[in-house]
């Protein structure tokens, strides 16, 4: 997969292009030694990357959360779990490809893994409906979660959606009901639930698989009731004010942690999760294992009581 850069990364991209050009020259003529120059440019690129990513604003973080190279749910399943067996369909209407889920092993332990799934090329994007689930997707997720409860398997969810699909067909099939039912049922499941926002956490479409005992976010992910563009269109009648909206919405992991709306922030590799998929998968796996160890120490009654108290603590009176 070729590396893509956002506009604020262009100076980094130019340095990386120079480095690749020098490497190409060396490969074509083995007599030319440009190692020192390549090392100098690599050091310069790394320092520039550190400086750039140390000062990202909320709008830049929002765009990082949507980066076209960013790892998706199936990427994390491949690198964190073993023996993944995908399960399909809601047993009522259809199989929604915007939600993937199934049984897997986490260090040998059976778990149920569920997450939003986007596509990278046009055909796959259409197949996955750009990561926007219809009601049957959320009903599939609930079916798998209820199965996990029956077999006493922890539930691991990965959140990455711009929102639930707002099409007419989805509304006719009960989009709001499907989301509401998931919220209610997840709050009562008797097994540990660990949720992680890996990209976009868009409104009810994210919440429908986001009610958990532990809710974490990757460093450059976002979680909000609406997109910055949508917020700007409502408040200022122009999507061009998206950067301003992002700042006031408090959608970054750091801000949500300050508000005690999430439990932890998983550090990403320098430059974002897509720069080193193995490293971010390792970091996320360690977070999940630590959370699971903590939740395993609780009785079922204590787990449910803690989850209830967590939900009741949200908001202001």
UniProtKB/Swiss-Prot annotation:
Protein's job: Component of the acetyl coenzyme A carboxylase (ACC) complex. First, biotin carboxylase catalyzes the carboxylation of biotin on its carrier protein (BCCP) and then the CO(2) group is transferred by the carboxyltransferase to acetyl-CoA to form malonyl-CoA.
Subunit structure as annotated in this protein's UniProt entry: Acetyl-CoA carboxylase is a heterohexamer composed of biotin carboxyl carrier protein (AccB), biotin carboxylase (AccC) and two subunits each of ACCase subunit alpha (AccA) and ACCase subunit beta (AccD).
Zinc recorded as keyword: no
Record keywords: ATP-binding, Cytoplasm, Fatty acid biosynthesis, Fatty acid metabolism, Lipid biosynthesis, Lipid metabolism, Nucleotide-binding, Transferase
Organism: Haemophilus ducreyi (strain 35000HP / ATCC 700724)
Protein name: Acetyl-coenzyme A carboxylase carboxyl transferase subunit alpha
PANTHER family (alphabetical): ACETYL-COENZYME A CARBOXYLASE CARBOXYL TRANSFERASE SUBUNIT ALPHA (PTHR42853), ACETYL-COENZYME A CARBOXYLASE CARBOXYL TRANSFERASE SUBUNIT ALPHA, CHLOROPLASTIC (PTHR42853:SF3)
Functional pathway: Lipid metabolism; malonyl-CoA biosynthesis; malonyl-CoA from acetyl-CoA: step 1/1
Lineage: Bacteria, Pseudomonadati, Pseudomonadota, Gammaproteobacteria, Pasteurellales
E.C. numbers: 2.1.3.15
Pfam families: ACCA
GO CC annotation terms, alphabetical: acetyl-CoA carboxylase complex
Reactions catalysed, as given in the entry: N(6)-carboxybiotinyl-L-lysyl-[protein] + acetyl-CoA = N(6)-biotinyl-L-lysyl-[protein] + malonyl-CoA
